[in-house]
């Protein structure tokens, strides 16, 4: 009996491109600049641009002092910075405050970079290390770093995509901030707005804690999440209500069980999350240009995530098929030697059980691909046939062992004649 040689398979290649900003926002609809009506207003207050001279000095807390005293070496990685903070601070509240302080004071806003969509499959670890090394970034970088530090400290956190209203008008670009679960309750943090402001294309440091640990409804006066779930409200505001500052009391809105939705969101993969986000956005009322842009971006990311999911399943199936082939070939070589030197029965059985388990996983992975673009179907079908071939071979050897173990030990050698 000869070994079943491993067949070569061309790896399915899918070129995935990270999406950048799809549409410029230099010219905005005049509707964005409507001031809030006084009747039934949601109290969307203006956040005026402030200079260091116009802000009352803040009284530093103990967590602030700990953050400001962090040695340079501690800020070289997420783990080392959180380890330093935990040497001096113990509660979620203290750690969240110190992290906000450190990020807002140590990261400089990069005025030469604009908002771009982050690839859902991007390597966050590399991005965060780049931020820590360069000590500069934009809102995405502030939010990503804050989230990473908070999660390292043991709290749940999310980066939130959205847009802003200031001085009665919508700001022209998307923005990112964070939600963190501090001491069992969700709060909002915007370390970018806590770092300073941009004037005449220059970043003016103006560290403050006005956007540190705010209740969701408080930050909702100026920050509108694209995903209604991140309002953390049973009655989310529609985009139009936020844009105008007027709550439509006649608008029929079913109770939104955001906590259950968030729990499901935490369990979803990238594709499932994107699909559910898009559905929630579409159900949240009339869109403005920014929301429309994000809907288009999300639709594109859904397509990319779908391709990536196919690629991941294919590569997993191919890897498992290869391992199963190697494992069953090892058994074949041992069988060709008439089980010499003799191994314990359990060890011999495992030589077939292992490839069987591997090929079953490969079969599950390849069959998880329900639909695929036409150009990917041929390699998928080819791999499926190869998996079936290995599975058949494994089953034949499994039947052989079943008969082998039924015989008395002295008669087993006859199985190899």
Q: Where do the language-model regions lie?
A:
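Active-site rim recognition segments
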Residues: 56, 113-116, 126, 180-258
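Secondary-structure boundary elements
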Residues: 38-134, 138
């Amino acid at each position: 009996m000869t070994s079943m040689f491993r067949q070569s398979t061309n790896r399915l290649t899918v070129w995935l491109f990270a999406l950048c900003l799809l549409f410029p926002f230099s010219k905005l609809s005049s509707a964005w600049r409507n001031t809030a009506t006084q009747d039934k207003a949601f109290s969307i207050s203006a956040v005026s641009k402030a200079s260091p001279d116009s802000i009352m000095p803040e009284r530093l807390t103990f967590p602030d002092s700990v953050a400001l005293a962090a040695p340079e070496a501690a800020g070289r990685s997420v783990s080392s910075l959180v380890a330093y903070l935990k040497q001096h601070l113990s509660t979620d509240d203290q750690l969240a405050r110190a992290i906000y302080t450190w990020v807002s004071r140590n990261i400089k806003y990069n005025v030469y970079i604009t908002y771009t969509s982050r690839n859902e499959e991007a390597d966050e670890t590399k991005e965060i290390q780049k931020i820590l090394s360069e000590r500069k970034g934009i809102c995405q970088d502030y939010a990503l770093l804050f989230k990473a530090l908070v999660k390292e400290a043991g709290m749940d956190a999310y980066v939130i995509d959205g847009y802003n209203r200031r001085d009665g008008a919508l700001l022209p670009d998307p923005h990112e901030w964070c939600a963190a679960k501090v001491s069992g309750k969700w709060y909002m943090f915007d370390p970018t707005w806590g770092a300073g402001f941009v004037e005449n294309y220059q970043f003016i440091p103006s560290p403050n804690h006005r956007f540190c640990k705010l209740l969701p409804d408080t930050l909702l006066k100026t920050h509108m999440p694209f995903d209604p779930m991140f309002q953390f409200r049973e009655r989310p505001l529609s985009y139009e209500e936020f844009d105008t500052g007027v709550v439509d009391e006649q608008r029929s809105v079913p109770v939104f069980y955001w906590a259950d939705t968030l729990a499901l969101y935490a369990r979803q993969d990238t594709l499932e999350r994107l699909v559910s986000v898009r559905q929630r956005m579409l159900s949240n009322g009339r869109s403005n240009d920014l929301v429309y842009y994000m809907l288009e971006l999300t639709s594109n990311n859904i397509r990319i995530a779908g391709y990536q999911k196919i690629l991941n399943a294919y590569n997993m199936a191919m890897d498992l098929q290869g391992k199963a082939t190697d494992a069953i070939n090892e058994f074949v070589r041992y069988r060709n030697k008439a089980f010499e030197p003799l191994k314990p029965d359990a060890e011999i059985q495992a030589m077939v059980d292992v490839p069987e388990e591997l090929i079953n996983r490969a079969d599950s992975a390849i069959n998880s691909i329900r639909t695929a673009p036409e150009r990917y179907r041929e390699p998928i079908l080819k791999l499926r046939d190869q998996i079936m071939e290995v599975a058949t071979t494994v089953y034949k050897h499994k039947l052989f062992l079943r008969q082998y173990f039924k015989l008395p030990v002295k008669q087993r050698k006859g199985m190899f004649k």
